[in-house]
Amino acid sequence: MYYENFFKKFIETHTENSQVICIDGVVGVGKSTLGELITKEFGINMFQEPVIDNPLLDKFYYDKKRYSFPLQIFFLNKRFQMMLEALELNSCLMDRSIYGDIIFSKMLCMDNEMTKEEYDVYEELLETMLKLVKKPKLMIYLKSSVSSAMAKIKERGRAYELEVPTEYWESLNRHYEAYFEAYNLSD
């Protein structure tokens, strides 16, 4: 119910069609792989998830309580910048987008890794930003079992992801399913 109410705030404000395609799903589901196939096939630009030059991501996995809020603000800001850049393009693809960011923040708040006050600041900022960008033309949700995603995470070999307990990935998967059951912004 939370996510349904969240989306209702933006349905009326986002009426223009755009050519933004977003791919979302849990960590390790294959968003980047699918994105590369789509961009190669259709010759469109792709915005990668900002994980390579992210100064907070590895720290977050070792100290979630300390780094959850600044990490979520970092991602929110980068994804907002990408959405603004996307307005200048005829079409583009996003490997994860500003729209799914709330999943992580909501989960962190529910798990007491982010304070309620931090979450409220985050949510208010997100709502302000979403009023300034167009909704995606298409949202692709890649659904996966936790065991399949974890196998891909192991194969990828990012040390900070390998340290994460299975319960975190299971919770993330449940939050994604709830989010996309309520998602109704794209055409």
Task: Please place each PLM-identified region on the residue numbering.
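P-loop (Walker A) phosphate-binding loop of NTP-binding proteins
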Residues: V26
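Conserved nucleotide-binding/hydrolysis micro-motifs of P-loop NTPases
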Residues: V51-D53, I98-G100, S144-A149
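A glycine- and Lys/Arg-enriched "phosphate-lid" helix/loop adjacent to the NTP-binding pocket
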Residues: F104-H175
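Conserved lysine of the Walker
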Residues: K31
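Extreme N-terminal, non-catalytic leader segments
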Residues: M1-Q19
